[in-house]
Regions:
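CheY-like receiver
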Residues: 56-139
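C-terminal output/effector regions of signal-responsive regulators
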Residues: 143-144
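Switch/coupling loops of ABC transporter nucleotide-binding domains
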Residues: 13, 43, 91
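Non-catalytic signal-transmission and effector/linker regions of two-component phosphorelay proteins
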Residues: 1-16, 29
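Helix N-cap/capping motif at the beta->alpha junctions
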Residues: 47-53, 77
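Conserved sequence signature across two-component system core domains
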Residues: 18-19, 48, 66, 96
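Two-component/phosphorelay signaling modules centered on CheY-like receiver
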Residues: 22-46, 86
Length: 144
């Protein structure tokens, strides 16, 4: 995932889906693709079976939007979101999980939304709309 100045490869919105349940990851990725087609947004949707796999891929680029499960083997989705924030990344985080216990922790990592499984298209689309809006408002950062 090579990123441009505002995130995304040459204007392509990079969306990462991270869920250890293959069926859930495929459903969420499919909904994200449906959202992009419906909005006329060019997007690349990648799936990852663990937070560790997504962390490893950060060397290739940071996603614009991360759709994260929370409870996974190894690092949790919440730990991944905290790491992204510690690194200063502007990745827009949406939690899609069946664990309600961490809903308030989402505020600590400035999550766009916290959705319960099974993912509903209307709620995921609204969360992706919000994430895209936030990305559009992001101020460019100069690192020297």
């Amino acid at each position: 995932m090579a990123r441009s100045e505002r995130g995304g490869e040459k204007g392509v919105l990079q969306i990462a889906v991270c869920d250890d349940e293959r069926a859930a990851a495929d459903l969420i990725a499919g909904l994200a693709r449906d959202w992009a087609r419906g909005r006329g947004v060019e997007a690349c949707v990648d799936t990852f079976a663990s937070a560790d796999a997504l962390l490893f891929s950060l060397d290739d680029g940071v996603p614009d939007v991360a759709l994260l499960d929370i409870e996974m083997p190894g690092a949790s989705g919440m730990e991944l979101a905290r790491l992204l924030r510690e690194r200063g990344e502007r990745t827009q985080v949406v939690f899609v999980t069946d664990i309600i216990d961490h809903v308030f922790d989402g505020y600590d990592v400035d999550a766009v939304s916290y959705l319960l499984k099974p993912a509903r298209a209307d709620r995921l689309f609204l969360a992706l709309d919000r994430a895209r809006e936030r990305l559009g408002r992001a101020e460019p950062v100069l690192v020297v």
